[in-house]
Amino acid sequence: MTPLDVMWVGLGGGVGSLGRWWIGRIVGEYHHGAFPLGTFLINISGAFVIGYLSVLFGVDWHDRYGTMLNAGVLTGILGGYTTFSSMQLDAVKLSHKGQGGLAVFYLVASVLSGLFAAWLDAMLAHLQG
């Protein structure tokens, strides 16, 4: 790891975090239900994009942090954009509000939808490539 790698991850993380904040606010202005739609859409769209880009960049999962593109885009931007911790917090908040069933649904739907989105876009990238 070089200082330049650290810079790319940090800059990308800042960009991704700002994107997450901005999209979360926009979704929150229109969606007022109990389901944490903003975090859900952010994580699924991030999984979709990372599936495609990992194929496009030819990511070797044994050394996925090795290039500037991987460090800046995959780890930085998409790592800052998606949020596992917010997903967990949303589920805890739902549980504390007596909506345990919705919390479980949210977690399962998030994981399965994210896996499907990443797989689908990786397959699309392979078809194009």
From Swiss-Prot:
The chain crosses the membrane at residues 4-24, 39-59, 65-85, 100-120. Keywords: Cell inner membrane, Cell membrane, Ion channel, Ion transport, Membrane, Metal-binding, Sodium, Transmembrane, Transmembrane helix, Transport. Na(+) is not transported, but it plays an essential structural role and its presence is essential for fluoride channel function. The keyword Cell inner membrane applies. It is a multi-pass membrane protein. GO terms for biological process: cellular detoxification of fluoride. The keyword Transport applies. It comes from the Bacteria. InterPro entries: FluC. One of its GO terms (molecular function) is fluoride channel activity. Fluoride-specific ion channel. Important for reducing fluoride concentration in the cell, thus reducing its toxicity. Belongs to the fluoride channel Fluc/FEX (TC 1.A.43) family. This is Fluoride-specific ion channel FluC 2. The gene is fluC2.
